[in-house]
Amino acid sequence: MKRREFIKNTTLTLSLCPLLSACTSKNDKFYLEDDQLPKHVRLDICTLCQLDCPQCFMRLQEEEIQKLNGFGYVSFDTFKKFVDKHPYVKEIGVSNHGEIFLNPDLDEIIKYSYEKGIKLNAYSGVNLNTISETTAEYLVKYQFGDMVVSIDGASPETYAIYRRGGDFNKVLDNIKMINKYKKLYNSDKPRLIYKFIPFGHNEHEIEKAKEVAASLDMDIMFDVNYAPGYSPLKNPEKVKEQTRISNIDNNFSNFYDAYQNGEEWFFCTDLFKNPQINFNGELQGCCMCVTEHFGVNVFEVGLEKALKSVNVQYAKKMLSDFSVVEKPEIPCTGCQIYEFLKKRNKTVF
């Protein structure tokens, strides 16, 4: 099953020569001035994970990922070079496909980012089963930003159904450890967010989860189950009322309508406003890509050249004009979101 079936809702890689050729026209140069370059990027600093969640695309596609990209983490030296080479980047989302706390260089990454005035966040989520005392303190001392903790339950028994290999009580203990340092430093950072995906097996704990989150001084967010065939909801209307999830039926049109009404975020805009970079430097573009990429390595050529590469330019053309011929080397081709837009003739740009 492909990653495209597990689209994320946020509250929100390589022969280079032909891809780095000059832009064909002035209109194709999307970033002409420094202030037009993205100030926000997502750099997946670790794709390793100790859990075995049944519908995780990193598990369902593990063999393919291992063959094409492998699993790994961004070393501190690589992270430092990226930061130093891209002074216009002011915020980095460091979570995506794995668990950031399995990166042995995380403490250095957190500290250096703070020293360089770069905000870090983990909007894409952490499982928080593993964290050292030092890292917990660094998160607070060096002002790590928002951190979404994926829990999906309010008891050890329910948590373990989906977060296989995880320990609910250990996660709560780790949250308390971070809170201890927040109190010590009199800091409200990192803001910890309790993430709960309603399933048929856990929907009875929604109200209890709200109470647990409040007791831990956490905000709570509810996310859509993008694999509705797994543990489908028993009472979707009640869940919708309890969680206020507007797209409980997994309807992409809600996202597009919000974008059309002034919301800045839509899946496809991430390629240009908040590009996703894999741990090995491959430009993946957006959250829809796991094994797919744009055939250019950001660590090797830099972000600006990567975003001006032929494949990225062509992707924007495809998203601006559906008469443009689809090409297999462009990740948008075959994408569920792209097909949704094309079917309704709703261009993004």
Please report, for each region that a protein language model flagged, where it lies by residue.
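Processing junctions and N-termini across compartments
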Residues: 17, 43, 47-50, 262, ...
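C-terminal accessory region of radical SAM enzymes
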Residues: 180-193, 219-221, 227-267, 282-283, ...
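Short, small/polar residue-rich loop motifs at catalytic or cofactor-binding pockets
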Residues: 269-271
